[in-house]
């Protein structure tokens, strides 16, 4: 049951990313995508121990890929915040820090 729930969550995250990929490349879209990637990294890292040994390397790779994608998207966001009004830029940067923190936490969980 747990793996079925995880599978459905991963499919939902994939669907969200697919929708975002089709949208304009606004800062908000990049933030949403970064947050979704951070969620995916967390999902993969947290469920790695429950996987059969043969599938653990794939979950670890998924964690690293999702975390790296989060960081790459945040670089794009940070380069665009100068075009936003002050309040929007501040909230965007808070979301960016949250996404990076969550992605980094997921990667650190792999080593513990």
Feature names for model-found ranges:
Residues 1-112:
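Conserved, well-structured ligand/cofactor-binding cores
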């Amino acid at each position: 049951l747990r793996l079925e729930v995880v599978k459905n969550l991963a499919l939902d995250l994939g669907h969200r990313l697919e929708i975002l990929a089709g949208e304009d490349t606004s800062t908000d879209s990049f933030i949403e995508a970064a947050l979704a990637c951070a969620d995916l990294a967390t999902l993969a890292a947290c469920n790695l121990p429950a996987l059969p040994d043969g599938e653990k390397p794939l979950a670890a790779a998924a964690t690293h890929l999702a975390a790296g994608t989060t960081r790459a998207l945040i670089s794009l966001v940070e380069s665009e915040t100068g075009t936003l009004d002050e309040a929007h830029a501040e909230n965007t940067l808070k979301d960016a820090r949250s996404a990076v923190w969550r992605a980094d936490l997921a990667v650190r969980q792999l080593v513990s």
